[in-house]
A protein has these predicted regions:
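Conserved catalytic core of nucleotide polymerization and phosphodiester-bond processing enzymes
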Residues: 1-181
Length: 181
C-alpha cells in the first residue's frame, strides 16, 4: 500500500520532481541552489560529489533533500507577493478600511472583512488574480498552474463556505444564504 501511494505521488508530481532534480543538478555545479526571486542556499557537499550513485555520501544526499525542501518552500514567497499585490489594490480602493490582513500561513492568507457584499466581491475578484500570478520564468509551466479560491468562515471558524472564482453577486448571496440556513 505504501509503495502504491508513493508511486501515485511520483506520477502526480512528475513535473515538479523533475524541476527540483534539475535545480539540484545545477546546485551540484554551482555550489548553491537558487530559490524564489534569487534566494541562494549553499550546497558545498553537493558541489564536491557525484550525485545519484551508491558511493554518494549520505551527508551529501541529506544536503540535497534539505536544499530541495528549501527550494520548494522558498516559493511560499508567492503568497507574500500575492498579498502585497492585493493589499496595494485594497489601499487604493474604497475598501481600505473594510479589508484587513490578519495572517499568512504557508500558502494561505487570512483577512478580516466587514460583513458586506461589496468587499467580498472585491476580494474574490482581485485576490484570485493575485494568487494566479506565475510570470516568473522558474515557475511558469503551461500545464502546472497556480491558483486558489476564497473561503468565508462565517459565523465562526468552524463553518467554511468555499466561494468559486468569478461568482456573481447574486450567486454569492445565494451561496451564503444556503450555507448559513
Amino acid at each position: 500500500m505504501a509503495k502504491q501511494v508513493e508511486a501515485r505521488y511520483q506520477e502526480l508530481y512528475v513535473v515538479s520532481s523533475q524541476w527540483v532534480q534539475n535545480k539540484l543538478n545545477q546546485a551540484a555545479k554551482d555550489g548553491y541552489v537558487t530559490g524564489a526571486f534569487g534566494l541562494r542556499v549553499r550546497t558545498p557537499l553537493l558541489h564536491q560529489v557525484i550525485r545519484g550513485n551508491r558511493r554518494t555520501p549520505y551527508e551529501a544526499e541529506a544536503e540535497g533533500r534539505t536544499a530541495g525542501n528549501a527550494l520548494g518552500q522558498s516559493w511560499c514567497l508567492l503568497n507574500s507577493r500575492a498579498c502585497s499585490e492585493f493589499m496595494a489594490k485594497v489601499r487604493a480602493s474604497q475598501h481600505r478600511l473594510t479589508i484587513r490582513p490578519c495572517a499568512q500561513i504557508h500558502d494561505a492568507q487570512y483577512y478580516l472583512i466587514r460583513d458586506d457584499l461589496d468587499p467580498l466581491m472585491f476580494t474574490n475578484e482581485h485576490l484570485a488574480k493575485a494568487v494566479n500570478w506565475n510570470d516568473h520564468p522558474d515557475i511558469y509551466h503551461p500545464e502546472v498552474g497556480l491558483g486558489g479560491e476564497l473561503s468565508i468562515f462565517y459565523p465562526d471558524w468552524s463553518k467554511e463556505i468555499e466561494v468559486p472564482n468569478g461568482i456573481s453577486e447574486q450567486g454569492l448571496i445565494e451561496l451564503v444564504q444556503s450555507a448559513t440556513g
